Amino acid sequence: MDVNPTLLFLKVPAQNAISTTFPYTGDPPYSHGTGTGYTMDTVNRTHQYSERGRWTKNTETGAPQLNPIDGPLPKDNEPSGYAQTDCVLEAMAFLEESHPGIFENSCIETMEVVQQTRVDKLTQGRQTYDWTLNRNQPAATALANTIEVFRSNGLMANESGRLIDFLKDVMDSMDREEMEITTHFQRKRRVRDNVTKKMVTQRTIGKKKHRLNKRSYLIRALTLNTMTKDAERGKLKRRAIATPGMQIRGFVYFVETLARSICEKLEQSGLPVGGNEKKAKLANVVRKMMTNSQDTEISFTITGDNTKWNENQNPRMFLAMITYITRNQPEWFRNILSIAPIMFSNKMARLGKGYMFESKSMKLRTQIPAEMLANIDLRYFNDSTRKKIEKIRPLLIDGTASLSPGMMMGMFNMLSTVLGVSILNLGQKRYTKTTYWWDGLQSSDDFALIVNAPNYAGIQAGVDRFYRTCKLLGINMSKKKSYINRTGTFEFTSFFYRYGFVANFSMELPSFGVSGINESADMSIGVTVIKNNMINNDLGPATAQMALQLFIKDYRYTYRCHRGDTQIQTRRSFEIKKLWDQTRSKTGLLVSDGGPNLYNIRNLHIPEVCLKWDLMDEDYQGRLCNPLNPFVSHKEIESVNNAVMMPAHGPAKIMEYDAVATTHSWVPKRNRSILNTSQRGILEDEQMYQRCCNLFEKFFPSSSYRRPVGISSMVEAMISRARIDARIDFESGRIKKEEFTEIMKTCSTIEELRRQK
């Protein structure tokens, strides 16, 4: 029978058909090779937007710096970064006037956070530029290396464990005439193998001390490393993103804490909330504008797009904003918040790995590191690359480019949102003093603008005024990419609004299926995704039931765990059949052990182990949840775990799922190839941290683990804990006198050894 596809839509309101327009099947594009070219593009573009600014030289590093602030106002529509200080300050003042006490209260909240935050806050986050090794590392390792170097240079404030004290060390380190660091390097030796008598290469890892003078250290401390942003859909060209080092991260964190606190109090801000909460917030603003545009007014909405938001923002402007926001606060607080923008005004962009060259005729491949770009002969490059290098050369120092204007992606999302909202706030009638007025939504660089006026001319005038106001603050609304509609239809941060937000279920499609973490997590994530989409994205019961069946099928094929009575033969089916035959209650077997699927759309919230627990054979229960099984990751599993989900569009989302530790929660082993590289030393450090942390957790099981108050080292904390526990156990008769004495003796010995060290 032929089905006419248009019949499917007869009963569907137009806005619900959005899910059928989904273009993103398949994998997103990933970048290969170096990001050097993209980074040079960013640096050159940023300088071009501010080219009529003033040039100065950094007295410490000698880096040339361009300052566009209060520069000439643009005469055309080209993007530019000439923000005017007085306009920014005035916008802040009006924002405060409309929200009395907002800055004061946010400062008080932030001050509390500043005094309580521990330095381990900086271990969150992924890749971080490690200035000691001059390349990227996981955040925790980069922090550990920084602290280790600080201590070996006599900077000890960080020992308190408070972030603010670590930042005190960062400040002191910048005044040092030199800093001594340890670098890892590799020695290769050719030796004859005793057994095979062949020559083999032996690798050993060496550590050597290396001194950085003040200038070199400052350059490293102010460096942002760059990488190419992966998995961006709908773009032909890749672009560069920045990973700042540990010196900058802590200061940025405090500024963003303040800005987040302000954003939470602003009804036009799309940050820091997300999901349904964000939709509710936005729907309120739209409702307000539509109810107020009675019969006398018309209302239009612009789905806005800004040209190169980050590259036209300026850290000097952020400094002005912070100075104003914190104007009545204690000196120490104002200082600590102003350091991040000051560091960003003096930032250096690391150009990445450099360029790959290959000569087809000579079959040669070679890498030109970024450090060589300053003085290499340019005739080897193609035209576009040659132009890039010529442009960037005056800015180069030691393979990094001086980049004073611009913000690099994703650094001050909250603070730049405050700046955007301050313009939306100026749309009230008491400020426009005319018949048109506006309001809107802002989330980092994305905005929606709602303009009300008595007639079309008024709408046009309102939009023009908004556009010009933005220019004064270094924001460039793109006339090409923004479009205007009758209020009631617009898009904001990938939410489509049409008389209410439309569920765009197809956005979630990429997160359906098997994640590939392990059998236990994958089952849990799979059903949670279906459950969440029933709650948030209009996934109907019939479709959900089908999604569930497809998921189970996919899961069984992925892990080769077809039902015990199946005819499909895989490497695993032999073992599964054996288990099936000797199990009395076959319904109790997990799907990953060849059992049946008991999930339906009513019980998706229950972890599979709990769902089947009462149906399991006793010996199966014992095997499944055996805490002594060496393959189980029993890292004090919290009842909630997080998985990173990649939707088709927009940022990666963190999704919570229930976790039950079983023999299926294995953790895949690390690839061994790292053991032969110069990173091996780092790996050994990592294992040492792991051991220390595991030991610490044995003394402080998560139930009793409160952050130690006062300043004591891990060892001191463990010793005092051991003594208390031993005394309680001895007095209640759980341990004998000899054991008690031995524990006490061991504790004293450890203390003695520490004193001698």
Swiss-Prot record:
Residues 286-483 form the RdRp catalytic domain. Phosphorylated by host PRKCA. The keyword Membrane does not apply. Residues 53-82 are annotated as: Disordered. It is found in: Host nucleus; Host cytoplasm. Keywords: Eukaryotic host gene expression shutoff by virus, Eukaryotic host transcription shutoff by virus, Host cytoplasm, Host gene expression shutoff by virus, Host nucleus, Host-virus interaction, Inhibition of host RNA polymerase II by virus, Nucleotide-binding, Nucleotidyltransferase, Phosphoprotein, RNA-directed RNA polymerase, Transferase, Viral RNA replication, Viral transcription. Residues 249-256 are annotated as: Promoter-binding site. GO terms for biological process: DNA-templated transcription; symbiont-mediated suppression of host gene expression; symbiont-mediated suppression of host mRNA transcription via inhibition of RNA polymerase II activity; viral RNA genome replication; viral transcription. Its EC number is 2.7.7.48. GO terms for cellular component: host cell cytoplasm; host cell nucleus. One of its GO terms (molecular function) is RNA-directed RNA polymerase activity. The keyword Transferase applies. Pfam families: Flu_PB1. A motif (Nuclear localization signal) lies at residues 187-195, 203-216. Coiled coil: none annotated. It catalyses: RNA(n) + a ribonucleoside 5'-triphosphate = RNA(n+1) + diphosphate. RNA-dependent RNA polymerase which is responsible for replication and transcription of virus RNA segments. The transcription of viral mRNAs occurs by a unique mechanism called cap-snatching. 5' methylated caps of cellular mRNAs are cleaved after 10-13 nucleotides by PA. In turn, these short capped RNAs are used as primers by PB1 for transcription of viral mRNAs. During virus replication, PB1 initiates RNA synthesis and copy vRNA into complementary RNA (cRNA) which in turn serves as a template for the production of more vRNAs. Belongs to the influenza viruses polymerase PB1 family. HAMAP family: INFV_RDRP. Influenza RNA polymerase is composed of three subunits: PB1, PB2 and PA. Interacts (via N-terminus) with PA (via C-terminus). Interacts (via C-terminus) with PB2 (via N-terminus); this interaction is essential for transcription initiation. Interacts (via C-terminus) with human PKP2 (via N-terminus); the interaction competitively inhibits the interaction between the RNA polymerase subunits PB1 and PB2. This is RNA-directed RNA polymerase catalytic subunit. The gene is PB1.
